[in-house]
């Protein structure tokens, strides 16, 4: 398959996401952007249906993540996992039996112009209509020495909840997958002496009526 696409036939670590990144980065002058997006969508429907879309749909059904008339903020960081989640949501919406709305939300915590442009270009390439808002979190945690990553993550979550609620959403979706869940458990046991994990869905205690869902909960990274 890869030789037919003009690529070298070598092992792509990371499974679908490795293939997807290679597809995005490969330059093909004159190729229409919507054709690239359709190729990605076709791969989700056929080539990677069992390992991606089936597990995505199973998690949503098994953990009762989506109800009729939900408005979901699909939170996109610009990385491979959140971009994949956005495409899976688009595919789900094509087949779902009840109505729900999607907003593809990108928070700019202080990216450089070049990094922000990469996110915008990749979203356009993959036909994901993103909404971007700014927060300047990077500036806020720049001088903090103790656990800046923890504080940054907390602030990011708060900004996402807040902006999603302003847009009329009742849920935010994050792109954590099965391997992230296992890693969180192991990190807690090894460094914190406690068992802690990521739940597939979580009601917010600070934002009334808001819920966090992780629809990639059953998807393996490899």
Positions of the model-derived regions?
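Rhodanese-like catalytic fold shared by cysteine-dependent sulfurtransferases
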Residues: 1-42
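Short, acidic/turn-prone active-site loops that include or flank metal/cofactor-
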Residues: 13-17, 192, 200-202
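ATP-dependent adenylation/nucleotidyltransferase module used to activate substrates
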Residues: 32-187, 191-195, 199
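Conserved, surface-exposed functional patches that form binding/active-site neighborhoods
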Residues: 187, 221-222
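Short, flexible loop segments at boundaries between secondary-structure elements
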Residues: 197-221
């Amino acid at each position: 398959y890869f030789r037919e696409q003009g690529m070298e036939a070598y092992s792509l670590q990371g499974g679908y996401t490795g293939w997807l990144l290679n597809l995005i980065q490969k330059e093909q002058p004159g190729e229409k952007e919507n054709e690239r997006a359709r190729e990605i969508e076709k791969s989700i429907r056929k080539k990677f249906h069992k390992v991606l879309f089936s597990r995505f749909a199973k998690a949503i059904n098994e953990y009762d993540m989506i109800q009729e008339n939900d408005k979901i903020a699909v939170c996109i960081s610009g990385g491979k996992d959140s971009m994949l989640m956005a495409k899976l949501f688009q595919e789900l919406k094509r087949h779902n039996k009840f109505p729900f709305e999607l907003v593809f939300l990108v928070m700019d915590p202080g990216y450089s112009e070049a990094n922000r442009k990469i996110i915008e270009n990749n979203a356009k390439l993959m036909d994901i209509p993103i909404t971007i808002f700014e927060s300047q979190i990077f500036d806020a945690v720049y001088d903090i020495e103790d656990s800046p990553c923890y504080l940054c993550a907390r602030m990011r979550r708060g900004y996402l909840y807040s902006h999603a609620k302003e847009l009329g959403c009742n849920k935010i979706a994050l792109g954590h997958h099965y391997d992230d869940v296992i890693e969180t458990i192991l990190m807690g046991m090894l460094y914190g002496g406690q068992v802690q994990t990521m739940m597939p869905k979580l009601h917010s205690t600070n934002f009334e009526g808001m819920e966090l869902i992780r629809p990639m909960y059953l998807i393996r990274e490899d």
